[in-house]
Amino acid sequence: MEDSNSTASNVARAILAVVDFSSTSDTRKSAVQFLDSVKSGDVRVLAKTSFHLVKKEWSSEIRLHAFKMLQHLVRLRWDELSPPECRGLVNLSIELMSEVANASENWPLKSQSAALVAEIVRREGPDRWQEIFTLLTSLSAQGPLQAELVLMTLRWLPEDITIYNDDLEGDRRRLLLRGLTQSLPEILPLLYNLLERHFGAAMSEAGMQHFDLAKQHADVVIACLNAIVAYTEWAPVPDLARYGILSGCSFLLSSSDFRLHACEVFKLVCSRKRPSDASTAEFDSAISNLFQILTNASREFLCRSSSSSSVIDDNDYDFAVCMCESMASLGSTNLQSISSDGGVMAVYLQQMLGFFQHFKLGLHFEALLFWLSLMRDLLPKPKAATYPSGGGSSTGGDDSSSQVDSEKKKTLSLINDDISSAILDVSFQRMLKKEKVPTGIALSLGPLELWSDEFEGKGDFGPYRSKLLELIKLTASHKPLISSTKISERVITLIKHLLASPAPLQHVAVMDSQQLALDCIVATLFDGSNEFAGGSSEVHYALRGIFEGLLQQLLSLKWNEPELMKVHVHYLDAMGPFLKYFPDAVGSLINKLFELLTSLPHVVKDPATSTSRAARLQICTSFIRIAKAAEKSVLPHMKGIADTMGYLAKEGTLLRGEHNILGEAFLVMASSAGAQQQQEVLAWLLEPLSQQWIQPEWQNNYLSDPMGLVRLCSNTSFMWSIYHTVTFFEKALKRSGYRKSNLNTTSATTPASHPMAHHLSWMLPPLLKLLRVLHSLWSPSVFQTLPPEMRAAMTMTDAERYSLLGEANPKLSKGVSVYADGSFEGTKEGQAEASESDIRNWLKGIRDCGYNVLGLSTTIGETFFKCLDANYVAMALMENLQSMEFRHIRLFIHTFITYIVKSCPADMWESWLGVLLHPLFIHCQQALSSAWPGLLQEGRAKVPDLFGIQSGSDMKLEVMEEKLLRDLTREIATLFSTMASPGLNTGVPVLEHSGHVGRVDMSTLTDLHAFRSNSMVGFLLNHKSVALPALQICLETFTWTDGEATTKVCYFCGVVVLLAKLTNNVELREFVSKDMFSAVIRGLGMESNAINSPDLVNICREIFIYLSDRDPAPRQVLLSLPCLTPNDLHAFEEATAKTSSPKEQKQLMRSLLLLGTGNNLKALAAQKSQNVITNVTARTRLPASAPETIGAGVLWDEEFVQ
């Protein structure tokens, strides 16, 4: 006895030493070691000591840890006890729960007592469940405190099944689930009886003003509802109804204290999947009854809240949200249970419409998700509706449609004109953000809560507005006439209000928000997928009348303010798809656009009037949108547009940037007219540019040396002329037959097939000269000689810095306007001098567009590769590679190198890729290898970029440096991944699924040279000088803390391993077997590679499986691991030889690596720790009067989780 007390005292002192913050680290470490020794020592001593320390005479810290020790015993050492000892511990644990069930005990001890019993039930399984359940039932009858603990135990049992637990094997989980399922006829009535008994007692005690007792009974009700929630997730719904659970919860809806918890039960039931067995009828009956309960409750709320917004408090709101979520879940998951009754469905839709129309944003948002889901499901997927009649839509079913389609048609017919109109009205009204509503308009909205930045938990405004627009689109597909009428009336009403307003600019935000709705509806009805031409003539006539009337209203407007004109143009844009079917109005719309353009000043002297410049650019961009939307309807007007452009250019009232945009619109129009028209338009647009572009005078004057570029930047007019020429080259390449799909193959189209092909020979040489001299500015020897203003202009733009910092881009200064494609328009164009900002924007624009032009030029066939000399291109672009900033190298790889790698014909790899990739890979390897150690060891990446920020911003500087380093690392890794893509490696067979270990037939091995023309990776490996720096980057990437880059590199390394397997190249095999294998294992030591660990383990598996018979290195690498013995390796080889499953082999390799490193591979060791029932407050909605000690319980549980 004395020994037992002595051990208990020593354990108590050790516990106090661990929790005492003043303890030294050595003291705490010794205490932990002692406690571990007790837990791993004699199991009976552990039991006696723990039960002794949970007694009341000990402090709460000691008692709590003693409970944890008991849980450890039950969880890990239960099998060491004899059956009588186990039975005795069960009884002691139940008694212990009874002892702590008093008001003076704190919450953590109560929760751990219940958790201990739950652990015992989990270990014992169904064998002793009946005995334990009898004890629990008896305990629950002793009083509210005891009942609460019993309910906590009952709650945790099913929760431990439904939440995955590594500590519970599949068989025991199934046994426990089966035992609980068989016990539902006992458990569910107990839950109902406790719920009924203690709810009545709580009401009774509260009526007698015995508030302490009332709270105890109320806590039992809450605990009971939490337990019910845990069973509701998996117990058969008919059982929940049969044993009174649903009716009991429905009764609680009348209580403001418990209705939210009861509604949580209903929400879970509504989301349960409808069975397809014999219980379907019972399930439908339960859901139907539940629907009636929710309908009555929601009707009462909607009627009460519609009369006055002041009657809703937070409790009402939370309950209403839960009701709305429940009903929405019912409609999304179990609509079939009520859809057969048209009257019930009509009531249901009206209820959900009421929530959608509610002034509270949270309720509206939940209903929005429901309506979106419903309309997506009801409307046919391949095509939107055709309209045989004016009333609605055909749902696309045929005579042989299934019963499901028939039900959908029936439900869709219930969404009538009134419901559709209401949905549209609400959607239109809520398209505006609260912060943009002027005060006067805000007052007219009343209590309506518009979306606000202060609204939490529902994401950003952009995604919310997108959901509204999708609902508008779906409604327009279902009810075209209703939606057209509503949007037309809405727009015309807003126009009238604006015209009558003394401050029309206040209405800009409201007008602009509705343009999106108009754009959505017009595009839905006239974009072609609706088979508009196939609908009835009555509908066509009605729609034409509606939109012709609206277009006439828009064309008659004469707004003079630039901000209003921008909105006006947006509305005209939105009408584009309508013009495709009714081309008569195209001429009027084009004339209106030119009228708006010429009414605005083309020369901006005062920066405050730069809104005019932005409005002009918006008008020009509208021509592109109209050309794309109206398609062939614009073709008859091309000559008129060209004549007007010529006249305005001759008059000097059309700036080059504006001319470029209109030229781009012409290219869009020409794409609808055929190849011949496209060639003619390109010739018309490019010929004037070529006359200046190919002249040797400007090239000799400005592009012969770096100082020439400085002179160019002092000639502002010519500087911007060059800029607009390059940007138009980019637009012409994008709009004239360029297709992204070309990038997925190495086969090239015939040069004549692309209208831009024969222009490359004169376009590209001067561009290469321009880029070469631009690159030279960053050379240290040149940089020092540049004027201060030029050096300052070579720093980052504000937008680039904000992007690196992950912050919202600031509004561009008033000195800069932006095209639709993101390029810049200098406000001093045509003037004598360019500012620092102008030069910075010009340099960035030339680089961005120049790289894009080169990249796009490679995609149109072999012309690029035949009209240029590879060595000259390499010299022009790579000459100053050593001086390039990381941001520029990343852009260069992304917009040019990747394109040329994808597009270069295989027979030209030798002449092109070798000269371009060799200097690039060498420099990137040196730069990255220098920068990463600085980040990993000193916390500061060494990058050459010029940030242009003031001192004192060290933290921001560090963030930007790291972002630049990671961006470049990921870009080069993406390039490697591209080079390893199947389309560029057609000669490499796909890895077989079989993983059999065996000797490779040496006769099947080929020379690596055989892959140099049918595999990009093979080509690379055949050029050692190019391959070595690339492979070095790959190996180092594994130890850089960038999981995204590692993902890309793994793909490349996989192909390298495959080529090592297929070829007889000794050097490659040795590299893969030793260097790559070792590097991959080192990569598994990085926690940042946890997400890539399956790929890394697979590479290890492939290296060993495919190469260990031909090279000793894989075995040597594994045996060099600190904890691996030859016997371990031998056992691994025997195990892998017995299975051909790659999945099983990967698991074996993973286990071997963990064993060999002593579980020291962080990427693999980041596993879920053993689950213990400690999350005692999870999914618990606490009553407002809950004691603060509950929060303390969470803290204690986390502290003693181990």
Curated annotation (Swiss-Prot):
Location in the cell: Nucleus
Tissue-level expression: Expressed in roots, leaves and floral buds.
Example GO molecular function: nuclear export signal receptor activity
Keywords: Acetylation, Nucleus, RNA-mediated gene silencing, Transport
Single Gene Ontology BP annotation: protein export from nucleus
Reported consequences of knocking out the gene: Reduced size of roots and shoot lateral organs. Accelerated vegetative phase change. Increased adaxial trichome density. Disruption of phyllotaxis of the inflorescence. Reduced fertility. Reduced levels of several miRNAs and increased levels of their targeted transcripts.
Highest taxon, organism lineage: Eukaryota
InterPro entries according to UniProt: ARM-like, ARM-type_fold, Exportin-1/Importin-b-like, Exportin-5_C, XPO1/5
Keyword Nucleus: yes
Keyword Isomerase found: no
Residue positions, PTM N-acetylmethionine: 1
Entry's Gene Ontology cellular component terms: nucleus
Pfam families: Exportin-5, Xpo1
Protein family according to the UniProt entry: Belongs to the exportin family.
PANTHER family attached to this UniProt entry: EXPORTIN 1/5 (PTHR11223), EXPORTIN-5 (PTHR11223:SF3)
Assembly and interaction partners: Interacts with RAN1.
Known function: Nucleocytoplasmic transporter involved in the nuclear export of microRNAs (miRNAs). Required for several miRNAs accumulation. Specifically required for miR156 accumulation which targets SPL3, SPL4 and SPL5 transcription factors. Involved in plant development through its role in miRNAs processing. Required for vegetative phase change and vegetative to reproductive phase transition. Functionally dependent on RAN1 binding. Does not seem to be involved in small interfering RNAs (siRNAs) processing.
Name the UniProt record assigns to this protein: Protein HASTY 1
Gene that this polypeptide is encoded by: HST1
